[in-house]
């Protein structure tokens, strides 16, 4: 596949290696959900889901539409929607066997009624708020009674119960430990009340890496699938992860500018000497952070080149000083390795004032994804949601 502007390269082999590393670290018998929300953190939900299928018991998404896309492309294992779902989407969820989070009796009653009307059984996971203050029942006696009432509703099956750590990615695990204790006790109380809960899960990526004692029945692997650690406070010598995505562009034009020449919008960069600069075919319209303007660097022929002036929607300029061999058509690495140099998602996030999870998620739909494994291209190039030929 030929690319003439910008593309993201996703290494499915590295994703497999990351899954193996996590799987080997889990306690025996612990299952794993693969979190593929936001199009698998920008990596492509369908190719990623198919790649990790043998490692997981199911998938976690954030929206109904994300779950439906997986079903349309033949994903058969459990799909758990982690975010709240309105009653207007219940029929689609029932028809496509999508498990829903549940944290209010009235919501459960509406889902039960819809399931009875459709002649189907709805699967739910009880959401428990142990410290995130997002969604979920508080882990108290009153909530145990609510879960009992929900469990008695017709055409509804409790498939699991979960909570989410708010601070497991910090060096101090005190908060995560307290959340785990609350959740563990609530799970025990619910089961003691006669409610069957097949799967209890609380550990996110940070929990998988550093808190194996909190694994419970299942864990939810997210950012670690894609080769990134949740934060720089999470130890990186426990599980070896490899970044799965690179972002590459091209030099489309080279020119020489003289002293006093301004570069890009606002003239925020003005040349102090004669310079050779490159125009690169990528911009914030592709999801490349505009906040890298005048601060970020790219790799050309294994050397770092500074971004000059403001990043435009579709293009930006870079300094070719010290890279005399650069020519039009040459590859430009925005994220990834070139020779002995590497630019990571974490570096881009730090320089731009963002969050490293954001960087791959923001890479736009107009950026083709090239999938590779063991150095060879697999599947096909994808630029739009439904283009999954070859997978």
Please identify what each model-predicted range represents.
Residues 1-16, 31, 39, 66, ...:
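Active-site anion/phosphate-binding pocket segments in diverse small-molecule metabolic enzymes
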Residues 23-26, 269-271:
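Short secondary-structure boundary/capping segments within folded domains
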């Amino acid at each position: 596949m030929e690319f003439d502007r910008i593309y993201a390269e996703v290494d499915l082999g590295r994703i497999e290696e990351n899954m193996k590393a996590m799987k080997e670290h889990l306690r025996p018998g612990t299952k794993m959900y693969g979190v593929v929300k936001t199009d698998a953190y920008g990596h492509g939900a369908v190719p990623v889901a198919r790649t990790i299928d043998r490692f997981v018991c199911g998938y976690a998404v954030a929206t109904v539409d994300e779950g439906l896309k997986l079903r349309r492309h033949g994903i058969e294992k459990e799909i758990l929607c982690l975010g709240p779902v309105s009653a207007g989407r219940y029929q689609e969820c029932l028809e496509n066997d999508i498990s829903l989070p549940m944290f209010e009796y009235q919501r459960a009653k509406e889902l039960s009624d819809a399931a009875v009307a459709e002649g189907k059984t709805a699967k739910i996971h009880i959401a428990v708020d142990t410290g995130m203050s997002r969604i979920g029942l508080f882990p108290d006696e009153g909530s145990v009674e609510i879960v009992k009432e929900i469990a008695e509703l017709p055409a509804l099956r409790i498939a699991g119960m979960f909570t989410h750590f708010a601070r497991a990615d910090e060096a101090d695990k005190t908060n995560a430990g307290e959340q785990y204790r609350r959740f563990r006790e609530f799970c025990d109380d619910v089961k003691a009340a006669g409610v069957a809960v097949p799967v209890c899960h609380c550990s996110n990526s940070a929990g998988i890496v550093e808190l194996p004692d909190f694994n419970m029945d299942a864990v939810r692997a997210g950012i670690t699938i894609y080769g990134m650690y949740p934060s720089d406070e999470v130890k990186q010598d426990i599980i070896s992860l490899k970044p799965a995505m690179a972002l590459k562009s091209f030099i489309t034009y080279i020119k020489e500018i003289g002293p006093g020449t301004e570069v890009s919008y606002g003239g925020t960069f003005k040349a102090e000497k004669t310079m050779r600069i490159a125009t690169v075919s990528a911009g914030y319209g592709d999801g490349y952070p505009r906040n890298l303007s005048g601060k970020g660097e790219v790799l050309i022929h294994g050397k770092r080149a500074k971004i000059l002036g403001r990043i435009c929607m579709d293009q930006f300029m870079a300094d070719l000083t010290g890279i005399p061999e650069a020519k039009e058509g040459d590859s430009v690495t925005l994220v990834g390795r070139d020779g002995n140099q590497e630019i990571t998602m974490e570096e881009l996030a730090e320089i731009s004032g963002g969050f490293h999870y954001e960087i791959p998620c923001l890479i736009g739909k107009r950026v083709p994804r090239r999938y590779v494994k063991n150095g060879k291209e697999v599947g096909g190039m994808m630029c739009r949601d439904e283009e999954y030929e070859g997978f």
